[in-house]
């Protein structure tokens, strides 16, 4: 159910509020371009600066606009287990198909603490759960052995792996087999992860080039490895450009340059430096995304 190019969609703002019209248009554009799933309220969606009502509103809009055409995987993670349960239950009530739960950040739990955190959430909620491992942001790395334990739970169905460590991903897939779906959380490793047995990606770059990203995964699934490889190299400069400053600053700036959203962030995130903005524009022009 959860495979291919799933966009870690941005949250557009306008004068400090969620730009609902721009958001709805973005979702429709993604579906038209072939995106396989929408992931609201993740890192790229600036979930950390949304209040509860805004968080729920973003999920609600996504579910309503998608209207069951493709899966909606709502970001519901927290470093408080009780809070994660609360948000996940709300996402379930709003109609999300699954929940994406980042590892608890700042409080740095042990592997046993991580296991108990996710098991508690799975025991007390009713939708499929996808773990999210991004130690570069959370300072905690959920190890393959811990994921293998969690994969025994019927509601824990996947993991977004954003370590960029293919040795760890390989061990993870070897230990878990088909019990869990492994998704790339690092666009640089999308093709490599597929070769190891992964099934898709929760992608930042898909925000600006949904058609090409979806086509990469479609080509792989059809066995057209050479075409998938060509798309990988075509997308590589864009993947790099999306991280010349902290995500989601570059991707939102790119979407603003493309006329899709306003160039607006919430503090402590702010606009790009002019130097990096010029570099970004050059990459977008080379890719044919802006004139």
UniProtKB/Swiss-Prot annotation:
CDD domains registered for this protein in UniProt: DHDPS
The keyword Cytoplasm is assigned to this record: yes
Location in the cell: Cytoplasm
Catalytic residue list: 132 (proton donor/acceptor), 160 (schiff-base intermediate with substrate)
Listed GO MF terms: 4-hydroxy-tetrahydrodipicolinate synthase activity
UniProt binding sites for pyruvate: 44, 202
Keyword annotations: Amino-acid biosynthesis, Cytoplasm, Diaminopimelate biosynthesis, Lyase, Lysine biosynthesis, Schiff base
One Pfam family per UniProt: DHDPS
HAMAP family, per the entry: DapA (MF_00418)
Main function: Catalyzes the condensation of (S)-aspartate-beta-semialdehyde [(S)-ASA] and pyruvate to 4-hydroxy-tetrahydrodipicolinate (HTPA).
Protein name, as recorded: 4-hydroxy-tetrahydrodipicolinate synthase
Organism per entry: Thermodesulfovibrio yellowstonii (strain ATCC 51303 / DSM 11347 / YP87)
Lineage: Bacteria, Pseudomonadati, Nitrospirota, Thermodesulfovibrionia, Thermodesulfovibrionales
